Amino acid sequence: GKYLPAAEYSFVTQVDGRGVYSFCMCPGGFVIPAATGPEQLVVNGMSPSNRGTAWSNSGMVVETHPEDVVQSEEELKDPLAMMHFQERVEKQCWQQANMKQTAPAQRMADFVNNRLSYDLPKSSYAPGLISSPLHFWMPSFVSKRLQEGFKTFGKNAHGFLTNEATLIAMETRTSSPVRIVRDRETLMHVRIQGLFPCGEGAGYAGGIVSAGVDGERCAEMCAEYLKQQ
């Protein structure tokens, strides 16, 4: 056909009780800036419809639980603890980029072997890259699991673990750090009538397709609710 299909690309493993997996492979795409506020550096990936660029990019995710990020019992009780962790990481990434939108980056094999990359390949990320020791400043529970995960993927797929691949920091918004509670049957907020928490921002999806499916379900339930008013 005229357009390439979505890439069949999936890597999944477990490292120290947490999932490490690929997310949203974009063949023939771009890495783009995705910050939504000051003092943040966030990246995301996309493909145009013809998937016609020279690059492919995928998120690499480490499953994260509240006990991984909190520093006290009191903090563990904070319902926004994961959001505060996300904010800290995004600000740290911005600081590592000299407080600009040039993204910290490292060649994959260098990252796995705790080496600084003295040069970087060309990239689709328009603001540019800055060589950075991601293995050193990223949260250790993330970097260590990524390193072990990449080693496993390299054993399972020849050519995966290579210095031709570039890690660009950081995609921190694969899923919401907060879930707004809703009823399992009506999909309505448990306290506020007529409010239907929906999609990625509310914590019920992680990607375009799942967000679309959840949106359709919520629209149907919203229509049923309005009929009864």
Which positions does each model-derived feature cover?
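Residues forming the flavin
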Residues: 1-229
